[in-house]
Amino acid sequence: MDVNEDAFINSSEFLMSKTNTAIYNSEGVDVSYEKYSVSGEFVVQCLTPQDVEQYQDFAYDDLDTEALATQAAQALEMVRMRAAATEAPEKGNYRLLLSGKELRDLMGLYVSRASAQMIYPGYSAYKKGMQVQGDEVKGEKLNLTLHASEPYSGEGIPMKDLQLIQNGTLERIYGTARFSYYLGVEPTGTYKAVKLDNGTKSFDEMKKAPYLHVVSFSDFSMDSFSGYFGGEIRLAYLYDGENVTPVTGGSVSGNLLELQKDMVFSTDCYKDKNYDGPFAVEFQNVAVAGR
């Protein structure tokens, strides 16, 4: 992928690890397993029309060369566009497209709110059988599965994939032994990876109407308590119905609890160590601070 004169990978680092885990306790738990992982980082650089560098990281349970090649190609294109971007988008409300890691982080709200650790202290009002997106969903209803990336939890609980949300309905509460017993539910262990089985619209279809697609934030944040998400725009593509313009600066501010009824997901997919699902999500009327 590093074949362009104007944009290139200027440095990279790969780490491969093998971890042996053994779990014992006074209740008779005696289990062990080994796990391999691949992670790393690289920096892409574009020299003209301005010198710009951008950092990328990656992590997989097994090396996914196809996904890594795609990420590298996208990173090279993004750093070229960032070097060409000179203005922030105008202040206003936009049809917003978020993709990749940002979409993964958004799904963290539902995973967090469905955990016994959040429900028992009263931080989350989730209950089994509730409609997590409300009763009047105009977009897609969520289908979210917790993926067991390890055979046992840190407490020695056998891990298995769990259907967390099906057609927008919370199917179960999950968590550690302590908080699960407090709530009277079966302990499952905690999960890091999710699979999202949604997607009704191709990414190309999403881009036919005017949009703002933020592909890089300076620091994207998702608050599972309040539902607010956002961050400063490092690079976004603005389509006005005729032309696509790279923009930089300004910030996005939205609330997933207010926007979740209208979510539409792409049929195009994205996968990393902790997420497997649609590449992009479409929101309507999201506030953007700009020039």
Outline where the language-model segments fall:
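Active-site bordering "gate/hinge" segments
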Residues: 1-143, 167, 280-291
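Dual-mode signal for accessory low-complexity, basic/Gly-rich regions
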Residues: 130-291
